[in-house]
């Protein structure tokens, strides 16, 4: 487990005070740098030792066959796996003839710092070689947010006590060996030498390697160039082979003298451009980097982040761990999306190979809601990527004998890659999640151009899918059969409430969008009768309810399923230890499902229903998913269980920083990082937007004395400063200087010329705090020794 002792709690940085080789893979994920196009895991500069080497380009993947013991019609035949591309991070240091390696000699001091304001990873090390030569190494690494194709490293070596001869080998390396993986289905498949050499060249102070994948036929280029500063004589040479380019720097240093190397990196890939064009793209990016210079890249990085934090920062007084974690989460969300530019946002971002680098519903359901309020330009690009896969989704629906478009459950390029139908294709709700993301973007930003450009087509085709999936019974009630909701322990069911409510919302949203754009809708074949059918299905959707218990059923009949014996089954995650034949017919819930419906479709439930539903389902949720704690935090806060909500918020925020789910080594959990923001802003800030108006209803737990968050809404920048007694709204920018929001259920008009302070509404719980399954209580702020072993 990652501890506070090694990673102290600090508001604007993640600092590792000592190097623990047993936690190397986890720290590589925490210290990953990315801009949404390039991703560099936080591997040590010298390349070894490593937990999981990793350099990624968004959507650069290889195809592999999906094995089936017994295949069936409509099963995907091929999977897609992100490729560990050419590694440009490596700078191998030799002191005299001895390699700098933290496993040998003496590491006198070692520290790494991820600076959330500067956007850099800095490493400081004092090392004494086995021959008693001491050097100080300081490296600073960045992946540029301002320049999409550029990364850079400043590497400084200082002699401390004796004259030393120093050699640095700066490399580009392709087809690195990958460590063996476990049988955990969340771990990536291993690709054996996925890159085929196309071209290699050496320049005066750098080199360039070009490769292509064998099956997906994607081509990539990686280039490097160097600036070298050193007193006295220096020798610089470069050589290149198909899988290796190396620039070697040799010099002598007296005590106090320094060798400074700035390594510029450029990456690009394409499925369409020619080899010369891709070569020239990488070369041009290197020239751009050298023109900017190291200081110019640093300044541009900080300026980009200053602008982001001005509209996105969250301040948490009284809970320093959550303070650090929410900023860490926002930083990585920005890194995953800032320059993705019409590529997917994978569930691990570009921090590791977990889930093969696939994007799921996590993107539209958990990540994009946060970015819509903090970095809307990135959301527009992510939605354009999803829309670019619409034809593939239509082809998939046709293959399955359905109308409209069926977006895939997991993918890189847009084709379905899930080999398990019950927790893949049957999770049809992803189509409504995507539709909701388009509608939220329109509502929050006030920008209709994205809907006009591509969103309308997505809304129409997903609505057509729902109409062909569902049916009216003889009583006129509309049903969805054979569906799986967010809870993957209750699969292929009738009338999952979450799915039915989301589908109904999708249908109504599509009909409303067609009214806003009648000519475009007509051109897509939409008729008045079709829109009426959408609305009729939405109005008639079955929402199962148990009158005897006074709770909604997660799906038809759920409250009559067999109760799960939590006392007898205590090894988690259950999907690694229990057969699905036991899980599916029982009242055991992997993650928030009905409870998530109450968050995303809040208006569909009364306060009393929410309170009773939370009480019932809390006792059955085991959180074998990192997507659950944030939702439970939001809904526990809404029904008045503020201290329990704070524990869930703490767990959601610390999943990666404390490696609570034991799989941070495979990459960070983007949705849970987003969940830290959602738990605080949606839970204790009371933010809702499902009725088309910005609704805020703050209420803080005892452990938080002040919650101050910033967000964007229709051109305005709004700061919400909540305390236990009152909340102050400060409006900046925006059209007209006035904005009407809903505060605690009442309309409130804010003006940009003066802040508005108003009392908060006290939340009194209708029921006592619910219990959880034995051993599945949230990781508590007050009992940090509790550790869960859960799954995504």
Curated annotation (Swiss-Prot):
Residues 766-776 have a biased composition (Pro residues). The active site is at residue 488. GO terms for molecular function: carbohydrate binding; glycosyltransferase activity; hydrolase activity, hydrolyzing O-glycosyl compounds. Keywords: Glycosidase, Hydrolase. InterPro entries: 6-hairpin_glycosidase_sf, 6hp_glycosidase-like_sf, Gal_mutarotase_sf_dom, Glyco_hydro_65_C, Glyco_hydro_65_M, Glyco_hydro_65_N, Glyco_hydro_65_N_sf, Malt_Pase/Glycosyl_Hdrlase. GO terms for biological process: carbohydrate metabolic process. The keyword Hydrolase applies. Substrate binds at residues 361-362, 590-591. It comes from the Bacteria. It is an enzyme of class 3 (hydrolase). Its EC number is 3.2.1.-. Residues 753-792 are annotated as: Disordered. Coiled coil: none annotated. PANTHER family: GLYCOSYL HYDROLASE-RELATED, GLYCOSYL TRANSFERASE. Belongs to the glycosyl hydrolase 65 family. This is Uncharacterized glycosyl hydrolase ML0392. It comes from Mycobacterium leprae (strain TN). The lineage of its organism: Bacteria, Bacillati, Actinomycetota, Actinomycetes, Mycobacteriales.
């Amino acid at each position: 487990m990652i501890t506070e002792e090694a990673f102290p709690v600090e508001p604007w940085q993640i600092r590792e005070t000592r190097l623990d080789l047993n936690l190397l893979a986890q720290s590589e994920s925490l210290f990953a740098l990315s801009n949404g196009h390039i991703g560099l895991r936080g591997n040590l500069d010298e390349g070894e030792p490593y937990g999981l080497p990793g350099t990624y380009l968004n959507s650069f993947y290889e195809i592999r066959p999906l094995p089936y013991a017994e295949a069936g019609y409509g099963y995907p035949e091929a999977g897609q796996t992100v490729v560990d591309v050419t590694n440009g991070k490596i700078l191998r240091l030799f002191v005299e003839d001895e390699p700098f390696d933290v496993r040998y000699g003496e590491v006198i001091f070692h520290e790494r710092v991820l600076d959330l304001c500067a956007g850099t990873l800095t490493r400081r090390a004092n090392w004494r070689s086995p021959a008693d030569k001491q050097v100080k190494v300081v490296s600073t690494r960045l992946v540029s947010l301002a320049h999409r194709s550029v990364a850079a490293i400043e590497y400084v070596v200082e002699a401390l006590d004796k004259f030393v001869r120093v050699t640095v080998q700066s490399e580009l390396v392709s087809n690195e060996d990958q460590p063996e993986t476990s049988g955990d289905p969340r771990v990536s498949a291993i690709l054996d030498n996925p890159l085929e050499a196309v071209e290699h060249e050496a320049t005066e102070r750098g080199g360039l390697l070009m490769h292509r994948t064998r099956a997906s036929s994607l081509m990539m280029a990686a280039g490097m160039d160097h600036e070298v500063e050193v007193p006295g004589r220096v020798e610089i040479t470069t050589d290149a082979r198909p899988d290796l380019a190396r620039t070697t720097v040799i010099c002598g240093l007296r005590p106090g003298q320094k060798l400074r190397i700035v390594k510029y990196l450029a990456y690009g890939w394409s499925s369409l451009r020619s080899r010369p064009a891709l070569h020239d793209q990488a070369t041009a990016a290197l020239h751009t980097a050298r023109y900017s210079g190291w200081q110019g890249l640093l300044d541009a990085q900080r300026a980009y982040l200053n602008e982001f934090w001005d509209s996105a920062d969250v301040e948490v007084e009284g809970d320093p761990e959550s303070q650090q974690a929410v900023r860490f989460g926002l930083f990585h969300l920005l890194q995953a999306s800032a320059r993705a530019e019409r590529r997917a946002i994978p569930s691990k971002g570009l921090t590791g190979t977990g889930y093969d680098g696939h994007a799921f519903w996590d993107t539209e359901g958990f990540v994009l809601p946060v970015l819509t309020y903090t970095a809307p330009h990135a959301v527009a690009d992510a939605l354009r990527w999803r829309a670019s896969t619409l034809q593939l989704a239509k082809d998939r629906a046709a293959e399955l004998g359905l109308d409209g478009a069926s977006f895939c459950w997991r993918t890189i390029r847009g084709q379905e890659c899930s080999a398990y139908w019950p927790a893949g294709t049957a999770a049809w709700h992803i189509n409504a999640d995507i539709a909701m993301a388009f509608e939220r973007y329109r509502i929050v930003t006030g920008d209709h151009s994205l809907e006009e450009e591509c969103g309308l087509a997505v809304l129409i085709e997903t609505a057509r899918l729902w109409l062909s999936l569902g049916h009216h019974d003889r009583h006129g009630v509309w049903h969805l059969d054979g569906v799986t909701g967010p809870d993957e322990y209750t699969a292929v069911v009738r009338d999952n409430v979450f799915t039915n409510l989301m589908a109904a919302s999708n249908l109504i949203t599509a009909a409303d969008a067609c009214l806003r754009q009648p000519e475009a809708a007509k051109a897509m074949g939409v008729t008045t009768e079709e829109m009426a059918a959408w609305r009729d299905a939405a109005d008639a959707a079955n929402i199962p309810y148990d009158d005897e218990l006074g709770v909604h059923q997660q799906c038809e009949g759920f409250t009559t399923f067999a109760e799960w014996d939590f006392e007898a089954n205590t090894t988690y995650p259950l999907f690694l230890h229990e057969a699905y034949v036991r899980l599916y017919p029982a009242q055991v819930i992997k993650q928030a499902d009905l409870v998530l419906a109450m968050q995303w479709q809040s208006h569909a439930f009364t306060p009393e229903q929410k309170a009773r539903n939370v009480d019932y389902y809390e006792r059955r949720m085991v959180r074998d998913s990192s997507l659950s704690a944030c939702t439970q935090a939001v809904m526990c806060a809404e029904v008045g269980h503020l201290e329990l909500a704070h524990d869930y918020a703490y767990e959601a925020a610390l999943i990666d920083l404390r490696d609570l789910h034991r799989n941070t080594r495979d990459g960070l959990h983007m949705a849970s990082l987003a969940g830290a923001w959602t738990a605080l802003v949606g839970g204790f800030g009371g933010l809702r937007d499902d009725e088309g108006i910005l609704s805020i209803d703050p209420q803080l737990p005892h452990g938080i004395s002040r919650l101050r968050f910033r967000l964007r809404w229709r051109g305005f920048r709004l700061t919400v400063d909540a305390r236990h007694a009152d909340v102050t709204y400060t409006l900046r920018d925006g059209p007209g200087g006035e904005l009407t929001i809903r505060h605690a259920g009442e309309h409130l008009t804010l003006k940009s010329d003066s802040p508005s302070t108003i009392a908060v509404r006290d939340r009194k719980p209708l029921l006592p705090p619910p219990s959880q399954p034995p051993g599945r209580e949230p990781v508590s702020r007050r009992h940090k020794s509790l550790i869960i072993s859960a799954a995504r």
